[in-house]
Amino acid sequence: MLKSKYSDGFFSIDKENGFLPLAEPLRQLPEAYTDLQTLIDQMPIEREDGSKGLLHTEGAFEKAVLQIENHLEQVKSEKDPFVRAALFRAYSFVCSAYTLAPAHHHFIANGTYGKAHRTVPKNIAQPFAEVADQLGQFPFLDYHYSYSLGNYYKINPDGGFNWENLGMAAKFSGMSDERGFIMLHVDINQYSPQLIEGSMGIVHAQDDEEMNHHLELVGTALKHMNARRRLMWEASRWKHYNDFRVFIMGVKGNTDIFDEGLIYEGVWDEPKAFRGQTGAQDNIIPTADIISGVVDFYPENQLTQYLMDLRQYRPVCVQDFLKDLKESSTGSAGTIARLKASNNQKGLQLLLKILEEIYLFRNGHWQFVQKYIMSNTAYPKATGGTPITSWIPNQIKAVLSAMTTVDQLTEDGAHGFDKKEWKVRFEKKVQLLNKQLEIVQVPSFNPEDVFKLNAALGLNDA
């Protein structure tokens, strides 16, 4: 049964907070962890005062990490959810920076990712595994507590959540492109309360009027999110993505960097392989996919299994919310089925608008991949370990399938709906994806050829 609130004390998934934390995350660790906080402050390639940090010099960060006290016993005693979240963030950054520093420096020297360190030192591994267990998370850099949603502070405390007003509490490169890239994700989530309210309202709607009101709320929220998402092109220059990308790589799916896994000294004897930080761990599209019915059109293949695997890399309260939302929106309780049963033509058109925004979000993300990743490196895996040329297209196909089904239920002319005009725009979407997938099947394809098709078919995101 869908509840009105899902909380772990740091996040509270409800119509007031959406997917953002209950309050601004701690920017600094408590005094008991001064040495760890100092390491975080000295870590970035470029520090806030313009000086070069530890990651700028090969081997310097690893040497500094070994001097940090093992705070295992202190971490065990922490009860405050915000302190736990800040500790998880700190140890996540140290773990990823330590293990991936060699890969970064190899890329700087040779243009390809080198091998990572395969062992996390005991003084980091033990307290990291402890706080991860407290939060119900894997001990590796994640999207929620570590890199994005739990890593912001407001530059102007009285200002809003626009990315220009957000700084990063912890950072790898320390450069403006890293800040713009990840803080824009926080920015987009400022509209998640409306998405939650609308989604919960759809589940509980008792008639067409209530249903349509909440469908409109979801569509409006997604439209705002897409408008903010498109600012990525100016917030973070695509040519600078590699300044920090290697540090958010995961172990699972990236054997070229990590071989068979990562050893956590004093925790596990066998190597572990966790997925890396990725925007695919965000909750906006999973929520929209469930409430719109797109989830029922996911292809049954390995790529969809990757998507399901990523669901584990979320706070437990988010996992519970998505699970309950799905269980409340299946079969005859699904949005498409309910709209069909009542022949709610206005609602079907509102659902098509939601599907349009989901498509634009995914296709915009696909265009980010084409420029930020494919144009920057020949490395075939995303930070989460998924194959970059097929991962998002797999999800776009699901959206297109859902669109086709909903269109078949709409009546031409109802509430001014023009089926012919809609189909023309829809066929352009299909044509674009098919042509792009043809290109990426060719060995040594030119990423620019893939990207140019977006403008050629009038679907350019930039």
PLM regions: where:
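Surface-exposed peri-terminal alpha-helical interaction modules
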Residues: M1-A462
